[in-house]
């Protein structure tokens, strides 16, 4: 009997060996990412047609040592290629692996191709043609260290290509992997199966194909073994016909029901089309639904929930996933008692958010990504009901409810879309939580080194889940940021390219925010009363805004009736943002000027006069584009002296900064001919009442003679 190699994903070797035994293979040998076996051609044909988890079947022609390219060429030349296929067949060489001497797979493929062609030409036969587009034959060369395996790929394109899927949702599973997940779950044909995040429906379709005993390769039209000289067309036709009959009968006798849900209607439509092409559309019910709210279908006794939820590369950047897994775990325990769940993910931290203990787990890669499949029993006991009723982080939840009751009422009265509902009120939950219309931003302060990473992560997941429960916010609308002490050079750090801008309202003014592209959102919430005050002071006045950021103070001044405005910032991005803010509020006249400049340098040489000046400089800055460093404690008098030249006789400077323990140098200020009034308390809004030092704010005017 000839030798063969069945290739599969790492972690599925033993499962594949069991499958091959069921298909008639005797004594299979498990190897890395595959199974070796010997079998008659009838069994091989059945394996190609019926294997659900093999990606390819290789007929092994030779195994030999490969130390260098000469060994490779001689090993390939030793095979009598014309005895296997005729020269009129097209072929391609697939070369997998490298070693110390053969470092390029394309070079390795070229040497094998040369050896094949040379065997034909030396036998006075025509050269076979090489074609990378739908070749008749694929020659497979696998190199691992100094060991090589050379043979024919009997399949052609991978066996995961069943023919029913032409498009998929985001990050689709390969059909072979999906079939393995079904096999490793607790599902069998006697149980209903539900996928609450079904995407394009691959898991459910693969399970349905198993239930109706439909061969996964039955719709496949081309097989590379058909181009070999020893191809037995009559035997193959008999095996395929037998499979088709079995499939037709199987569809009619299936009792199992399958249910798929996804939030995306377009993906559900794709899943329905895939099921139709697979011939199992009558077995699967697809519908739009949220996994965190999915209800138990009627008759779903002892059912199985199987899914592949989304998983981010880093927990800290995927708060929506923390909320999703937490809420999904709660829903499973609350609604699906007596059932089992099988969840596949690359992220153990996210699986921990389910708050469920796995009965079994299997390591199984998704491509190159290490993943794990965990099976859970969902108990229906009193213990389960008690666990469901326990609040997550009750102390934190109670504080959040109290804050929302008080601050939410105030925000609605003041017509504010954006406000803070929690600001590290409790030492164990060290974060700030802000509402931005329909979104929640959780800004986690970096945990001290004395707190273990596991404990900090658990507190974070508790906070996120509790916030979702208390606020009712959609899980996709939760955004997490980690706040650390910012140096001047990264005070407005760019985080990602997501470009999600939308309008919010603040005291009748519309302002544009972006919650994800930058560490800050475009709106400093602690200054909402300061901006309101500037709007009330600005009527008929010439207004100057320095270190303007996104110009929100300018918008308030303009909407308050300012005669003119000048907005200055060093960042072109933020100046353009400021212009959009003004345009959104209909403030588009030429009396509103915007200037990109180093504010410190501009102040030293600028002229012009203003009635109202707002300046909110950084605490410290050493930006490469600034000619000098700036320290607000050290340099505030110099700053105010420069502003004095531009301040009209009855004018006002509103000076603010965020330095804790800032001290105004009253003596130096008086010497400069200015006087100051501290209005920090008056500009502290209710949502920042606990944080007395969030900012300092002063009214600066000319000293009376």
Swiss-Prot record:
Domain of life of the native organism: Bacteria
Signal peptide: none
Gene behind this protein: rlmL
Family matches, as SMART domains: THUMP
Catalyzed reaction equations: guanosine(2445) in 23S rRNA + S-adenosyl-L-methionine = N(2)-methylguanosine(2445) in 23S rRNA + S-adenosyl-L-homocysteine + H(+); guanosine(2069) in 23S rRNA + S-adenosyl-L-methionine = N(2)-methylguanosine(2069) in 23S rRNA + S-adenosyl-L-homocysteine + H(+)
Protein name, UniProt field: Ribosomal RNA large subunit methyltransferase K/L
Keyword tags: Cytoplasm, Methyltransferase, RNA-binding, rRNA processing, S-adenosyl-L-methionine, Transferase
Homology family: Belongs to the methyltransferase superfamily. RlmKL family.
Function according to Swiss-Prot or TrEMBL: Specifically methylates the guanine in position 2445 (m2G2445) and the guanine in position 2069 (m7G2069) of 23S rRNA.
EC number: 2.1.1.173, 2.1.1.264
GO cellular component terms given for this protein: cytoplasm
Subcellular location: Cytoplasm
Keyword Cytoplasm in annotation: yes
Lineage of origin: Bacteria, Pseudomonadati, Pseudomonadota, Gammaproteobacteria, Vibrionales
Tagged with keyword Zinc: no
Annotated Pfam families: Methyltrans_SAM (PF10672), RlmL_1st (PF22020), THUMP (PF02926), UPF0020 (PF01170)
GO molecular-function terms, A-Z: 23S rRNA (guanine(2445)-N(2))-methyltransferase activity; RNA binding; rRNA (guanine-N7-)-methyltransferase activity
Annotated THUMP domain residues: 43-154
């Amino acid at each position: 009997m000839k030798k063969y190699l069945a290739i599969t994903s790492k972690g599925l070797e033993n499962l594949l060996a069991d499958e091959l035994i069921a298909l008639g293979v005797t004594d299979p040998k498990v190897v890395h990412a595959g199974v070796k076996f010997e079998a008659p051609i009838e069994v091989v044909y059945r394996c190609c047609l019926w294997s659900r988890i093999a990606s390819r079947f290789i007929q092994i022609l030779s195994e030999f040592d490969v130390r260098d390219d000469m060994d490779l060429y001689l090993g390939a030349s030793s095979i009598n290629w014309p005895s296997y296929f005729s020269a009129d067949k097209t072929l391609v060489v697939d070369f997998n692996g490298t070693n110390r001497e053969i470092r390029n797979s394309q070079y390795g493929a070229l040497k094998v191709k040369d050896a094949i062609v040379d065997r034909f030409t030396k036998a006075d036969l025509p050269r076979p043609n090489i074609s990378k587009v739908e070749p008749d034959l694929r020659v497979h060369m696998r190199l691992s260290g100094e060991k090589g395996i050379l043979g024919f790929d009997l399949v052609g394109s991978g066996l995961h290509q069943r023919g029913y899927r032409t498009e998929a949702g985001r990050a689709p599973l390969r059909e072979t992997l999906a079939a393995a997940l079904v096999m490793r779950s607790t599902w069998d044909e006697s149980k209903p199966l539900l996928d609450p995040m079904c995407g394009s429906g691959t898991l459910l379709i693969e399970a349905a194909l198993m239930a109706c005993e439909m061969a996964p390769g039955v719709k496949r039209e081309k097989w590379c073994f058909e181009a070999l000289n020893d191809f037995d067309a009559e035997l193959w036709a008999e095996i395929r016909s037998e499979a088709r009959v079995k499939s037709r009968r199987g569809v009619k006798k299936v009792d199992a029901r399958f249910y798929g849900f996804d939030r995306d209607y377009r993906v559900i439509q794709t899943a329905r089309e895939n099921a139709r092409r697979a011939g199992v559309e009558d077995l699967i019910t697809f519908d739009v639904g949220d996994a965190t709210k999915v209800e138990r279908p009627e008759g779903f006794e002892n059912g199985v929930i199987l899914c592949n939820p989304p998983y981010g590369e880093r927990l800290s950047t995927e708060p929506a996933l923390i909320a999703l897994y937490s809420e999904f775990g709660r829903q499973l325990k609350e609604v699906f008692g007596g059932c089992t769940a099988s969840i596949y993910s690359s992220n153990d931290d996210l699986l921990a958010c389910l708050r469920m203990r796995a009965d079994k787990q299997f390591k199984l890669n998704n491509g190159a990504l290490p993943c794990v499949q965990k099976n859970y029993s969902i108990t229906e006991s009193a213990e389960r009901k008690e666990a469901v009723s326990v609040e997550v982080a009750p102390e934190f939840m109670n504080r959040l409810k109290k804050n929302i009751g008080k601050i939410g009422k105030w925000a609605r009265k003041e017509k504010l879309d954006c406000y803070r509902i929690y600001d590290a009120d409790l030492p164990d939950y060290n974060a700030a939580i802000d509402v931005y219309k329909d979104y929640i931003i959780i800004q986690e302060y970096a945990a001290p080194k004395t707190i273990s990473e596991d404990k900090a992560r658990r507190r974070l997941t508790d906070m996120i889940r509790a916030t979702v429960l208390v606020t009712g916010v959609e899980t996709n609308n939760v955004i997490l940021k980690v706040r650390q002490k910012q140096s001047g050079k990264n005070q407005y750090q760019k985080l990602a390219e997501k470009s999600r801008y939308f309008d919010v309202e603040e005291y009748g003014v519309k302002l544009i925010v972006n919650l994800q592209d930058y560490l800050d959102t475009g709106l400093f919430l602690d200054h909402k009363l300061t901006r309101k005050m500037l709007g009330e002071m600005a009527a008929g006045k010439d207004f100057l805004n320095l270190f303007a950021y996104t110009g929100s103070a300018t918008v308030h001044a303009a909407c308050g009736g300012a005669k003119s405005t000048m907005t200055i910032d060093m960042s072109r991005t933020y100046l353009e943002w400021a212009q959009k803010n003004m345009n959104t509020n209909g403030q588009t006249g030429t009396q509103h000027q915007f200037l990109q400049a180093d504010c410190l340098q501009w102040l030293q040489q600028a002229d012009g006069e203003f009635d109202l000046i707002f300046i909110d400089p950084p605490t410290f800055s050493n930006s490469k584009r600034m000619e000098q460093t700036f320290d607000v404690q050290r340099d505030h008098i110099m700053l105010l002296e420069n502003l004095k030249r531009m301040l009209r006789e009855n004018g006002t400077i509103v000076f603010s900064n965020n330095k804790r323990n800032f001290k105004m140098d009253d003596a130096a200020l008086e010497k400069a001919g200015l006087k100051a009034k501290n209005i920090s308390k008056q500009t502290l809004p209710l949502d920042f009442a606990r944080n007395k030092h969030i900012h300092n704010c002063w009214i600066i005017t000319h000293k009376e003679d």
